[in-house]
Design a protein with these regions (language model features):
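Surface-exposed interaction regions that form or flank ligand-binding interfaces
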Residues: 1-153, 160-170, 176-302
Length: 302
């Protein structure tokens, strides 16, 4: 009874040493988890149901009431602003580099998911780069695998500007276009799953496959670790975020409390744009290190 815990402790210590040696040797650890593709447990779902006042229903998901659609919600002006932006014109000035959504056709997603992804990334690009952008933007980039080779585990967007102290600052963004209007919120059930909730209808919302939950990928967590050394060469201050885009005319689902694996936080488009504008100095593109520009250019999917 005493030996087993001791053995487990030793095993954990050895594994951590092994992981550190792999990282020091340029090989990074994968954070993938089989649990992400499994249904969350009833014990983790129950507190979410209680928090949002979801009514019990024996026919629903894990004994809780479910609906197929939320109550809609108020629209926003994001799509209206985005419609005025000419990405080709911005690309001609070097402000937009790469094509939003490029490479999704080669992914394992369904045709509907690919179409939604391209639409969402294009909307994000136009909304973020509207007006007088303070950043250069890169779209649809290759990420790194465990051995720092180019990988299809991609990065949807990178925004780069200059802070008042002269340091380059970058946002690495994973765009998400999820079901629901502003009535819907996505809330962590655990570290790997989000539940979809209609606040007005006090119910979980089912997707087209009849699921009230969605799993989260550790890709941004992994990419953050793998890019760290390269970004340090150029003194880059980096932020790694998930950005949710409105799927239709009823506003954007609320994902502001959602946290992805590795502590990657989520924000909507107006919040991201406001953060960029508050951090970056305008008209400082020439101060962005040329080596950093070349590095990001080399990762663009064409």
């Amino acid at each position: 009874m005493i030996a087993m815990p001791f053995i487990l402790v030793i095993a954990i210590i050895l594994q951590r040493r092994h992981n550190r040696k792999r990282a020091q040797g340029g090989v990074f650890v994968s954070h993938r988890s089989e649990y992400a593709n499994m249904e969350p447990s009833p014990a983790d779902v129950a507190p979410v149901a209680a928090r949002y006042g979801i009514m019990p229903d024996a026919r629903g998901w894990m004994g809780w009431r479910c609906v197929t659609h939320d109550a809609g919600g108020m629209g926003d002006n994001i799509r209206g602003v985005a419609a005025t932006v000419d990405l080709n014109g911005l690309a001609a000035y070097g402000l937009v580099r790469g094509v939003p959504g490029s490479g999704l056709e080669d992914s394992s997603f369904t045709a509907d998911q690919i179409g939604a992804g391209i639409w969402g990334e294009s909307l994000l690009a136009r909304a973020i780069m509207a007006g007088r952008p303070r950043v250069l933007s890169w779209w649809s980039l290759y990420g790194f695998d465990e051995c720092l080779r180019l990988s299809d585990s991609d990065i949807d967007c990178v925004l780069v500007g200059i802070r008042p102290d002269g340091r380059p600052v970058a946002w690495f963004v994973d765009a998400k276009r999820y079901k629901g209007g502003s009535d819907t919120c996505y809330v962590n059930v655990d570290a790997w799953h989000l539940a979809r909730v209609s606040r007005a209808r006090r119910a979980f919302v089912l997707d087209s496959e009849g699921r009230a939950w969605t799993s989260m990928s550790p890709n941004m967590w992994e990419q953050r670790e793998r890019w760290q050394g390269l970004l340090a060469r150029y003194g880059v201050v980096s932020y790694w975020v998930v950005c949710v885009t409105p799927p239709g005319g009823h506003g954007t689902p609320d994902m502001t409390t959602a946290v992805w694996p590795g502590g990657v936080t989520c924000m909507d488009i107006p919040s991201l744009r406001a953060m960029v504008d508050s951090v970056c100095v305008p008209d400082m593109f020439a101060a962005i290190p040329p080596g950093l520009v070349s590095l990001l250019d080399s990762h663009i999917k064409y």
